[in-house]
């Protein structure tokens, strides 16, 4: 069996060799396909081979888009070869990181302007509060109410003092009544009997004692600080009035209303002033104050 197989294999190899030799002789007998007189074609450029070599892993992006981590097929950057440089893409603008400002140090122009405005308001409020004596309010609403009340009192005081230059008592009375209505009942001494006076218009003993203490207090405050004196008079429901004006008003109201007002005045010595005035009581709605008169000469 082995000899038979060996002989069969040898015959098959010989037949193949004969077929190969016949094929080679047939090909050599064929005429050439090109003209040998023509020059050989130029070799391909080396850049093409270089680009193909660099772009060899490019098809892998289509087979494994998730593993490559590159851009999608629809984007221009994904279709662009990796070995070339893009000349049409816009420059990437990097956003500046936002820095959070520390407390009290704003960086926004609007915030800075608002902070400066609040600081100016606080400074003006402090200066305005210093003009009003004996202020003890801390919140802005209460402080503004107190300042408004004090300014109204000063306006009333100025109007009353300006009446000393008026001529007749007949014209002073209606003006003073108008001031009483404007001040909300602060100057009601001419429209209601004063507490502490008897039926004859004379002051009682307790009224005289309170009169003296009030006069001394007002005179001392006027020597130290005029603003504090005004604040004290405002709290007591009093208002400074020249003696001549009080006398004229008293005479006018005595003849017209039957002696409803009887001013009481006393002189208080002061070295630095020659002003003579009387403090006329203005009873409040809550409690009626005694008729107090004070003068500063």
UniProtKB/Swiss-Prot annotation:
Give an example GO biological process: root hair cell development
Task: List the keywords (alphabetical).
Answer: DNA-binding, Nucleus, Transcription, Transcription regulation
List every stretch annotated Basic motif.
105-118
Instruction: Give the disruption phenotype, in one or two sentences.
Output: No visible phenotype under normal growth conditions. The triple mutant lrl1, lrl2 and lrl3 exhibit very short root hairs.
Q: Where is the bHLH domain?
A: 105-154
- Residue ranges of the region described as Helix-loop-helix motif: 119-154
Which stretches are tagged as biased composition: Polar residues? 73-90
Q: Which GO terms describe its cellular component?
A: nucleus
A GO term, aspect molecular function: transcription cis-regulatory region binding
Which Pfam families did the record assign?
HLH
Among InterPro entries, the record links this protein to: bHLH_dom, HLH_DNA-bd_sf, IND-like
Write out the ranges of the annotated region (Disordered): 59-109
The chain's disulfide connectivity reads: none
Name the organs or tissues of expression.
Expressed in trichomes of the root maturation zone. Detected constitutively in flowers.
Q: Where in the cell is it found?
A: Nucleus
Induction info reads:
Repressed by heat treatment.
Its assembly, as annotated, is: Homodimer.
User: Any idea what job this protein has?
Assistant: Transcription factor that regulates the development of root hairs. Does not seem to be involved in the regulation of sperm cell development.
User: What is the protein's name according to its record?
Assistant: Transcription factor LRL3
Organism, as annotated:
Arabidopsis thaliana (Mouse-ear cress)
List the taxonomic lineage.
Eukaryota, Viridiplantae, Streptophyta, Embryophyta, Tracheophyta
- The encoding gene is LRL3
């Amino acid at each position: 069996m082995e000899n038979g197989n060996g002989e069969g294999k040898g015959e098959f190899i010989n037949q193949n060799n004969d077929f190969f030799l016949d094929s080679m002789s047939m090909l050599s007998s064929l005429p050439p396909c090109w003209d040998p007189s023509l020059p050989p074609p130029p070799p391909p450029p080396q850049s093409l081979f270089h680009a193909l070599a660099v772009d060899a892993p490019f098809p892998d992006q289509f087979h494994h888009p998730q593993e490559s981590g590159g851009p999608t097929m629809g984007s221009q950057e994904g279709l662009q070869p990796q070995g070339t440089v893009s000349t049409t893409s816009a420059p990437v603008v990097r956003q500046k990181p936002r820095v959070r400002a520390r407390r009290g140090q704003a960086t926004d122009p609007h915030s800075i302007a608002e902070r400066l405005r609040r600081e100016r308001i606080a400074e003006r409020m402090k200066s305005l509060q210093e003009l009003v004596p004996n202020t003890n309010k801390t919140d802005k609403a209460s402080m503004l109410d107190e300042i408004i009340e004090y300014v109204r009192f000063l306006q009333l005081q100025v109007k009353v003092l300006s009446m000393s230059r008026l001529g007749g008592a007949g014209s002073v009375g209606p003006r003073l009544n108008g001031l009483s209505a404007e001040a909300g009942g602060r100057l009601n001494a001419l429209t209601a009997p004063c507490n502490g006076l008897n039926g004859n218009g004379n002051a009682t003993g307790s009224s005289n004692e309170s009169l003296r203490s009030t006069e001394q207090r007002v005179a001392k405050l006027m020597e130290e600080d005029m603003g504090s004196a005004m604040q004290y008079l405002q709290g007591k429901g009093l208002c400074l009035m020249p003696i001549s004006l009080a006398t004229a008003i008293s005479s006018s109201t005595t003849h017209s209303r039957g002696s409803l007002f009887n001013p009481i005045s006393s002189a208080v010595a002061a070295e630095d002033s020659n002003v003579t005035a009387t403090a006329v009581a203005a009873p409040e709605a809550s409690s009626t104050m005694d008729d107090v008169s004070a003068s500063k000469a």
